[in-house]
């Protein structure tokens, strides 16, 4: 979602004179915040998920489905309960926020989940209730799906139907995407679209490889002449699905998990340890094979979002000699991270890092250590796109808005999140960002709990998963390929090694040994389930952690169901949503094996998806035979026992 500041947003031309000021003061804000809170210690594990939903409307008479652009109307109703609860002092069950599309909403639990193992048993129940609450506000021909809509940009894909206007600068001159498909209830989203185009010097160009079926033309070249002149579609490539608007990426739905660390050192350590895991979860959660009504040759939204917000100038993309720009920048501002940030991980930073020398010096002079200073200075090679006229001058001791406007628009696979200055209850956090959103609440809960259990296992066993950061970049590319779970190999640590420089051991760089070369290519199955006489598998390590914990019967059952499900998906016995979707399309009687996924197919696909997500139709190919024992509440006895255990362990730690 990003930073939702109130005010009057500046255009790109209006922003440019303020860029250096905003960067300088953004860094000052970070330095002040860091030193004020760097000694904060003892925060409990709290965590939460963010799920984005698409609202769709079925036209049964014509067998067509469209996105329903009513997010603002829904949010007004959903957020009214939050306002009432605030007045009454009542806890919220969930929170609702806008997303990029006018057909999208984002839901989170009303309060973070706590450190109790029993909390894993209430996650799915909360997700189910969220979906039910939204559906009660919809009409009979509408539904709420946790998917990326496959026909974005197809003529008439919105309800109400609005045509794209290539002459409309507010819609970034797209030939596919109407302004009304962007959420207009907050200026952030439209302004981001315009300012990315303004900085880049042209509209974004997204080209996704087409899936070559038996009847797909070769080369595949679309006739887009009816949509505009040659200049309007000049960036289209043969054998690719062409798109030209931020909405094709940011209009996809995602699943993210944020968790709080005990202190800043643990947050930085977890950021690094989880980074090599991100491509594995991207492949394991693959869910997005269709773009603009065409079957693509990739299974993930990741590179599509990356291209949709790529604001680099031609010089920064290496297309023209450097003249007005400072650097050639290898990646979009939405991509995988280029550096580890924990002091003893720096030996694995093998990618040349572009960073702002002036910003870096300001950070070093402000007593920020080198690894963190380089990470922040690297983020600050990007310019701010969200500047509000009323918020240019700020108190750098009390605000972090200038820092966050750049930090929150560096969309990487991991995000290191300092505490907000105005929320003393929130500590140092890490956000895990690559996972594709799943069709059902069971799947989404399984992935969220799996990631959080990974963090608990990592902290408990202090094993290291680090590899050269360039290998993570390579793995992210492999993870998006069609059927990556079945066909790709991923670079990964082949043996277990204890991290000698874990936060509680770190006294200085003397603990940091040379980078390990103990890396080999493994399948997703081998990484998740283990390899004979080799890596034991992430699930095996999680089970060992759980064996040392006191877990109630229902929670243990639920966690076991989630882990068994993840295990079977890793083997390929259970399909990824992307694989299942391809199979549905290719076996549909209306499919002509030409890569075109027409209205009739999409209608039947989403009808089937709705039935599965509602529990009306159980699909074993997609879900297996697993059921959790999720509940809305933790029993008082279990809560009391686990809280006593946590207090006892904290006393032993001190």
From Swiss-Prot:
Family: Belongs to the glutamate--cysteine ligase type 3 family.
EC class of the enzyme, as a word: ligase
Pathway membership, UniProt: Sulfur metabolism; glutathione biosynthesis; glutathione from L-cysteine and L-glutamate: step 1/2
Keywords: ATP-binding, Glutathione biosynthesis, Ligase, Nucleotide-binding, Stress response
UniProt name for this protein: Glutamate--cysteine ligase
Keyword Acyltransferase applies: no
Entry keyword annotation includes Manganese: no
Primary gene name: gcs-1
Database matches in Pfam families: GCS
EC identifiers of the protein: 6.3.2.2
Task of the protein: Plays a role in resistance to arsenite. May play a role in the oxidative stress response induced by reactive oxygen species produced during infection by pathogenic bacteria. Together with trxr-1, required for the reduction of disulfide groups in the cuticle during molting.
Domain of life: Eukaryota
Consequences of knocking out this gene: RNAi-mediated knockdown of gsr-1 in mutants lacking trxr-1 causes an arrest during larval molting characterized by a partial detachment of the old cuticle and an impaired ability to reduce cuticle components. Also results in growth arrest during the postdauer molt. RNAi-mediated knockdown causes a severe loss of viability upon arsenite treatment.
Gene Ontology terms for molecular function: ATP binding; glutamate-cysteine ligase activity
Organism phylogeny: Eukaryota, Metazoa, Ecdysozoa, Nematoda, Chromadorea
Catalysed reactions listed for this entry: L-cysteine + L-glutamate + ATP = gamma-L-glutamyl-L-cysteine + ADP + phosphate + H(+)
Parts of the chain that traverse the membrane: none
């Amino acid at each position: 979602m990003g930073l939702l500041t109130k005010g009057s947003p500046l255009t790109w031309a209006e922003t440019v004179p303020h860029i250096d000021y905003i960067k300088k003061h953004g860094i000052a804000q970070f330095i002040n915040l860091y030193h004020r809170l760097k000694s904060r210690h003892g925060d409990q594990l709290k965590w939460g998920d963010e799920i984005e939903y698409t609202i769709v409307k079925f036209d049964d008479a014509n067998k067509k489905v469209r996105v329903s652009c009513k997010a603002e109307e829904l949010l007004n109703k959903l957020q009214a309960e939050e306002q009432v609860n605030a007045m009454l002092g009542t806890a919220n069950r969930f929170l609702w926020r806008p997303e990029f599309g006018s057909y999208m909403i984002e839901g989170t639990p009303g309060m973070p989940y706590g450190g109790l193992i029993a909390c894993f048993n209430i996650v799915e129940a909360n997700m189910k209730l969220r979906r039910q609450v939204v559906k009660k506000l919809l009409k009979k021909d509408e539904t709420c799906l946790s998917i990326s809509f496959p026909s974005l940009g197809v003529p008439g894909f919105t309800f109400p139907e609005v045509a794209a206007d290539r002459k409309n600068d507010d819609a970034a001159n797209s030939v596919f995407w109407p302004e009304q498909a962007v959420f207009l209830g907050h200026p952030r989203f439209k302004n981001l679209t315009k300012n990315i185009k303004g900085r880049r010097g042209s509209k974004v160009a997204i080209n996704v490889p087409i899936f070559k079926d038996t009847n797909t033309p070769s080369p595949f070249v679309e006739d887009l002449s009816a949509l505009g002149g040659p200049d309007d579609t000049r960036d289209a490539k043969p054998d690719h699905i062409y798109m030209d608007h931020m909405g094709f990426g940011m209009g996809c739905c995602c699943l993210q998990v944020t968790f709080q660390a005990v202190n800043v050192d643990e947050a930085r350590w977890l950021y690094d340890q989880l980074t090599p895991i991100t491509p594995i979860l991207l492949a394991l959660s693959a869910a997005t094979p269709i773009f603009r009504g065409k079957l693509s040759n990739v299974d993930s939204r990741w590179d599509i979002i990356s291209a949709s917000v790529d604001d680099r100038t031609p010089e920064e993309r290496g297309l023209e000699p450097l003249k007005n720009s400072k650097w050639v920048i290898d990646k979009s501002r939405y991509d995988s991270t280029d550096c580890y940030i924990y002091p003893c991980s720096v030996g694995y930073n093998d990618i040349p890092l572009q960073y702002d020398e002036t910003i870096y010096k300001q950070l070093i002079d402000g007593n920020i250590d080198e690894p963190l200073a380089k990470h922040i200075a690297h983020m600050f090679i990007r310019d701010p796109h969200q500047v509000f006229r009323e918020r240019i001058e700020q108190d750098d001791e009390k605000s972090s808005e200038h820092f966050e406007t750049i930090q929150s628009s560096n969309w990487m696979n991991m995000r290191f999140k300092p505490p907000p200055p105005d929320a003393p209850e929130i500590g140092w956090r890490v956000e895990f960002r690559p996972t594709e959103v799943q069709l059902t609440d069971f799947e989404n809960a399984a992935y969220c709990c799996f990631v959080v259990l990974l963090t608990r296992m990592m902290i408990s066993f202090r094993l290291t998963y680090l590899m050269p950061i360039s290998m993570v970049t390579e793995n992210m590319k492999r993870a998006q390929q069609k059927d990556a779970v079945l066909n790709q190999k991923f670079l990964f640590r082949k043996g277990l090694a204890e991290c000698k420089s874990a936060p509680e051991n770190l006294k200085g760089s003397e603990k940091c040994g040379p980078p390990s070369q103990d890396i080999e290519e493994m399948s997703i199955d081998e990484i998740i389930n283990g390899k004979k006489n080799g890596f034991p598998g992430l699930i095996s390590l999680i089970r060992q952690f759980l064996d040392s914990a006191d877990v109630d019967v229902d929670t243990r059952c639920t966690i076991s169901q989630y882990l068994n499900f993840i295990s079977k998906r890793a083997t390929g016995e259970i399909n990824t949503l992307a694989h299942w979707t391809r199979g549905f399309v290719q076996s549909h009687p209306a499919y002509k094996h030409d890569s075109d996924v027409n209205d009739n197919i999409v209608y039947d696909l989403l009808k089937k998806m709705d039935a599965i997500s509602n529990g009306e139709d159980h699909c074993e190919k997609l879900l297996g035979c697993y059921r959790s024992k999720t509940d809305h509440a933790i029993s008082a006895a279990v809560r009391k026992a686990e809280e006593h255990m946590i207090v006892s362990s904290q006393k032993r730690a001190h």
